[in-house]
Every structure is written in structure tokens, then in C-alpha cells.
Amino acid sequence: MKKLTLREQQLVCLNILDYFHALCERYKISYSLGGGTLIGAIRHKGFIPWDDDIDVYMHRDEYQRFVDVWFQETHEHYNMETAEDILAQYTGEMAKIFDCRTQITDAKGRKSPMFMDIFIYDGVPNEPKIIYPLMKKHRRIKLRFSSCKKRWLRAKENTVQKAILNKLSHFLFSKMQKNLAQFQIKYPIKQCDYIGLVLSDYGGWQKSYMPKEYFNHVIYKEFEGRQFQVMNGYHEHLTQYYGDYMKLPPEEDQKPHHIQEAYIL
């Protein structure tokens, strides 16, 4: 195995993004660079110098189209973990695309291939004051499921405890998925003025939704010498989420936050 420098890690992530982007372009699927990756595109025209991952955003319907396309094709070096996979690291919250030729140890000591995150936006109520109670309800179920799932996966094999936690985890997973499906029927994106990350705590609930007009369509912005899709209201979104996003953080915060070490296998 070869240990990767930060820049080499970034280039692996960039290759994943290139692969994802090419598939989206081929099938006319929309997405947007998100989070620190979006800041990087606008402020640095590439990675934030100390960043070590890639984030993208997708509307639910575009995400579902992408999943359908992904599993119709074969991918030599890449694997996708969907948000609907009960064994996913962040079931319900996000999807991931992994480069199976690599291995990382993250800040919590967990090992996995290097990956790109896909955050999924659903329609949410047009009245912001009722968004939080609804998100809180759905996230409460998700937290119960996540807690049970951890105990299930850690329990000893071939024990009564393992069997009980298995059944309970699947019950809570089904309940979470059913509730989310009902939510999506009640608040279809096309009829909503706001979109949000219903099951994700990414940034706290106040920052996990935005006016749909920020992400009505996409434009293209430079990132590492390439052109990638970016939401039309990127400035408004980044200002809502980060404030003065063009200002560099304090020097002591200018360091990688996700990966402890990374290797090419």
C-alpha cells in the first residue's frame, strides 16, 4: 500500500467526481457541488487547500434517476452505497460513491474506501415555522434506528441479542422509510417553495433547508480546471449557511477534518 498525501487524496476524490459528473451529463441529470466543495469552486476555483472530501447535492427525483442509471451499468473501480441501504454508514441521510482501490481511516477511526458524499434534498413545507417540528419527528425515528443498528452490528453472532436487535433494526428502518415516503408524497418538490435535508443533521436544522429558488436550475463553475454543475443561487445558499464564505477561517482551523490517513491498495 502507498500512503497518500493530502493533494493525492484530493485527486482521488476529483476522479470520483469526474466519474459521477460524466454519468450525470450523459443522462442529463442535475446536481450541484455542495458544502466545502462549493466554497472551493467559488473561492478557490478548486479544492479548499486543506479540504479532503467532495460533497454534492441532488433533488430527490434527480438522485433516484441517478441510482437507477448507476445500477444499469457496471463500474470497474467504483461502488455506490445508497441512502436506502440498511447497512449504509448514513442510512436515510446520504449516498456515497467509493473508490474501491483505496482505503482511509477517518477521524473516528473507521475504515472504508475513499468516497464522495451525495446529500439528497426533498420538498418541505412552505411555512418555515413548521419545518423544524416535522424534521424533528423524522430525525427522532432515524436516531432510534441508528442507535439500534449500532448495537445490532456489534452484538455477538448467533446470539438471541443479535436476533432481537436484527428484527428491531429492520422494523425501525421500515418505519423510517415509510414515513419518509409519505412525507415525499405530501410535499412533492415540484409543489414546494422550500427544499431540505429531512433526515440529515448536516449543519443543524436551521441550515438544512433553503428556498427552492436557490436550486431551481444549475450553471457551470470552474473546479480544478474543469466545469461542474452548481446551483443557480449558490451565493444566497452559501451566505445563509456560512455567512461571509469568501473569508478564510482562522489559521488554526485550516486543516483536514475527515481523514486521518489514506492509502492506495
UniProtKB/Swiss-Prot annotation:
Superkingdom of the source species: Bacteria
InterPro entries: LicD/FKTN/FKRP_NTP_transf, LPS_cholinephosphotransferase
EC class name: transferase
One GO MF term: transferase activity
Function: Transfers phosphorylcholine (ChoP) from choline diphosphonucleoside to the lipopolysaccharide (LPS).
Family: Belongs to the LicD transferase family.
Misc note: Lipopolysaccharide (LPS) is a glycolipid that is a necessary component and antigenic determinant of the outer membrane and has been shown to be an important factor in the host-parasite interaction in a number of Gram-negative species.
Name of the molecule in the record: Lipopolysaccharide cholinephosphotransferase LicD
Taxonomic source organism: Haemophilus influenzae (strain ATCC 51907 / DSM 11121 / KW20 / Rd)
Name of the encoding gene: licD
